[in-house]
Amino acid sequence: MRLKIMELRYKRELEKLIEKAEKSLEASENLYNSEFYDFAVSRIYYSMFYCVKALLLTKEINPKKHSGVLKMFAKEFIKTNELDVELFEYINEAYNYRQTADYDATIEIKKEEAEYLLHKGHIFLNKTKKYLISKNILKGENDNTKS
């Protein structure tokens, strides 16, 4: 019943968040390929952040601050074992890289670090989409049914 209500209230926003997550990850790849590693890790973090916001919408939770988003993600999905703890580790790591990249001009993000985080970003997005598809909230790639 809760997911049916969510579908009516949040489905469009959830789909837009996943779209933003995909675009952020694509932008991070372009930035990585242009050797803008600091900017790439920031976009990778935001890709994960948008995924988490979409996941929280499935429980009708919509925190406004980054700290609230991460806290509620841990409470609602990680501590309940609904999703793997590695996803929380990935977004925390991405958050720390983003903080460094955005706010510490003396530290340069290395190519290997950006590449590593980009890989984690793809895993995060794929696992988010897989979860949403498994809950019949998001259509699968080959699903032509109406959502």
Swiss-Prot record:
Keywords: Toxin-antitoxin system. Gene3D superfamilies: Nucleotidyltransferases domain 2 (1.20.120.330). InterPro entries: HEPN_dom, UPF0332_toxin. Belongs to the UPF0332 family. Putative toxin component of a putative type VII toxin-antitoxin (TA) system. Its cognate antitoxin might be MJ0141. This is Putative toxin MJ0142.
